[in-house]
Design a protein with these regions (language model features):
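Conserved functional hotspot residues or short segments at active or partner-binding sites
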Residues: 385-446
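Hydrophobic beta-strand signal
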Residues: 168-169, 373
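Terminal targeting/pro-maturation regions of precursor/exported proteins
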Residues: 2-108, 143
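Cleft-lining beta-strand/loop regions that shape enzyme active-site pockets
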Residues: 23, 40, 55-62, 148-163, ...
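PDZ/PDZ-like groove recognition
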Residues: 97, 136-147, 151, 233-238, ...
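Short acidic, Pro/Gly- and aromatic-enriched capping/linker segments at domain boundaries
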Residues: 366-378, 393
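Extended, small/polar residue-biased N-terminal targeting/export presequences
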Residues: 81-146, 194-196, 200-213, 220-226, ...
């Protein structure tokens, strides 16, 4: 499965939100857009100056020292740069804020978000209906952007798009070499508006290009998808992200698996970018027996550390299990994989070393509706090990060939795939998991 359509990362909203900043008054009455952005920048300078306590930031102080350099540069640009039409105060402020957060080195996690990005992320994590075309993507940059799966009841599901298709253009613009983040704004848009994708497809050694026009519509992306693999009677369950209903959807999938008396479960966390911490804890607890010293993770902050214990009532604590991860398994998904591996040593984790997130985020709203997410806690595996910037290493390292589209329960269910068809698809990581649960007899049993 490819990355989540909106690349949602892990965060924890359980703490009280910081106080909203007061609004400085400027000469001339009302506030211009530039003044609103300057307010946001002043808030960030307060962070840069180190003025924050355990509960909230004192945003009424004026920056001194190194932070004053930002305002000096800002004033010099506005006062002296000759091409005045090129000066975009909001763009400068957002760039400065992003650069400050990026300098922390919490790559792929602590970050700045515009109001639009924040709204889209919150919508996705609440599993609310979203507007788009309904595809999961992977690749980008040095690799082509590929459709890995299509969301049911979405515009893409009603088109001739297929998993494995490469998107090489959007509305006539060549996107080869773009990252998914760069291409996404071209694909997304307002409800009811059209978008034309240029698709490259290879079938039987023949490559063709054609255009597909879709109308962007509202749809709801699933959080958990599952498929009982015929003949093998193995439940293949994938968590796409840890949104607000992840555990509720997981329990439904596990109840169905238990009803079918499955022989084992494959928990696929590949390309899962994370989500809510409480949902990660709840999902991990479905597979781990609760008890003394049974923890999902350890949270370490400036003031000390605390443990998050395994919750009682898990539905699959005795079921044979294999977990799949890859380099895009991040944050909350890494918490789940690590918790299962530490608490159930008989369970094998298969795939590639994970992303290595390692921090718990807290949201700090800025005055114009944008926000910064800061890692205010580091999380550790139940044994005290940190995976920050190094990732979690699976028991069995298995790479997925570049030319192979990973199988997913979405695809398997849509196409009613047999066990043999799944094995023949060449998903080396999934096949390794099937062999792990069948003692190497998956192909024979299929």
């Amino acid at each position: 499965m490819g990355t989540n359509p909106f690349d949602i990362e892990s965060f924890d909203r359980s703490e009280e939100q910081p106080a909203k900043p007061s609004t400085p008054q400027y000469p001339g009455g009302g506030q211009s857009a530039a003044q609103v952005v300057i307010t946001a920048l002043l808030v960030i300078i307060a962070f840069a100056s180190g003025w924050f306590g355990n509960a909230y930031v004192n945003r009424n102080n004026i920056a001194t020292g190194d932070a004053q350099l930002i305002l000096q540069a800002w004033n010099d640009i506005n006062q002296y740069y000759v091409v005045t039409g090129s000066i975009d105060n909001k763009k400068m402020a957002y760039a400065a804020i992003s650069a400050m957060v990026d300098s922390l080195g919490d790559t792929g996690h602590s970050r700045f978000e515009t109001p639009e990005q924040l709204a889209r992320e919150q919508q996705q994590l609440q599993n609310a209906p979203t507007v788009g075309i309904g595809v999961y993507l992977s690749g980008g940059g040095s690799k082509p952007i590929r459709i890995d799966a299509i969301i049911p009841d979405s515009p893409a599901s009603r088109s001739k798009l297929q998993p494995g298709d490469l998107i090489v253009g959007v509305n006539g613009k060549d996107i080869q070499g773009m990252t998914i983040d760069q291409a996404r704004p071209l694909i997304l848009g307002k409800k009811g508006t059209p978008v034309t994708l240029t698709i490259q497809r290879t079938t039987g050694g023949t490559t063709s290009r054609f255009d597909v026009t879709l109308t962007r519509e509202e749809f709801t992306a699933p959080t958990v998808v599952s498929y009982i693999i015929p003949n093998l009677n193995i439940a293949y369950i994938q968590v796409l992200q840890f949104s607000s209903d992840a555990d509720a959807q997981m329990r439904k999938a596990l109840q169905e698996a238990n009803k079918q008396h499955v022989q084992g479960i494959i928990l696929d966390l590949r390309d899962n970018p994370g989500g809510y911490l409480d949902q990660a804890r709840a999902v991990a607890s479905e597979f781990i027996k609760a008890g003394p010293k049974k923890n999902v993770l350890i949270e370490k902050s400036r003031s000390g550390q605390q443990t998050q214990s395994v919750l009682p009532g898990g539905l699959a604590t005795n079921t044979p299990l294999t977990v799949l991860v890859n380099q895009n398994t991040a944050s909350a998904a890494e918490i789940v994989a690590g918790a299962i591996a530490i608490n159930r040593p008989e369970v094998h984790v298969i795939g590639e070393t994970t992303f290595g997130t390692g921090t718990v985020l807290k949201e700090f709203m800025l005055s114009d509706g944008s926000a910064i997410w800061l890692g205010t806690e580091e999380w550790l595996l139940p044994n005290g090990e940190s995976i920050y910037h190094k990732g979690f290493t699976p028991d069995q390292k298995v790479a997925l060939p570049d030319n192979v589209v990973p199988v997913s329960p979405l695809v398997a269910k849509e196409q009613h795939l047999t066990a043999k068809q799944i094995i023949d698809a060449g998903d080396t990581q999934l096949n390794a998991a099937l062999n792990d649960l069948t003692n190497g007899q998956a192909a024979a049993a299929a």
